[in-house]
């Protein structure tokens, strides 16, 4: 399926920004969004998280559809659980583990989230600590 058809199938408000198509989605809708992306044969690219002043995280999931980037953005409140998509997209494992390492995110639906970039004895959330905003 091409990117235009997939956006139309998923429906909702998509907007073009920075060379990609974006959609805002509540955090509870991410697993459904991932399923729809998989049905549309979108390739999972990555997860990006950035911290906000109120200690929430802006999280975006990115998929590639034959060279067109479809990105879905959600807000994760402080201490909130992020739903895993690794059972839908196994390739999301490393991105979820990296997000855990850097932002101390806990994933609902994962048996474990072992460190990827940190040692097992390191405390997750190193990017939050460098900004002085430990979760």
Question: Where would I find each of the regions flagged by the language model?
Answer:
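Terminal low-complexity/charged segments
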Residues: 1-135
């Amino acid at each position: 399926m091409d990117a235009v058809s997939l956006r139309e199938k998923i429906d909702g408000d998509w907007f073009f920004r920075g060379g990609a198509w974006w959609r805002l989605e509540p955090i509870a809708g991410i697993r459904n969004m991932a399923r729809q992306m998989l049905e549309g044969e979108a390739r999972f690219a990555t997860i990006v998280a950035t911290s906000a002043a109120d200690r929430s995280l802006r999280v975006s999931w990115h998929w590639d559809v034959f060279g067109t980037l479809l990105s879905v953005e959600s807000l994760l409140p402080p201490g909130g659980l992020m739903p895993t998509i690794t059972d839908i997209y196994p390739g999301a494992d490393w991105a979820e583990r990296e997000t855990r390492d850097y932002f101390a995110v806990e994933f609902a639906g994962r048996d474990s989230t072992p460190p990827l970039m940190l040692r097992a004895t390191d405390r997750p959330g190193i990017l939050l600590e460098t900004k002085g905003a430990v979760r």
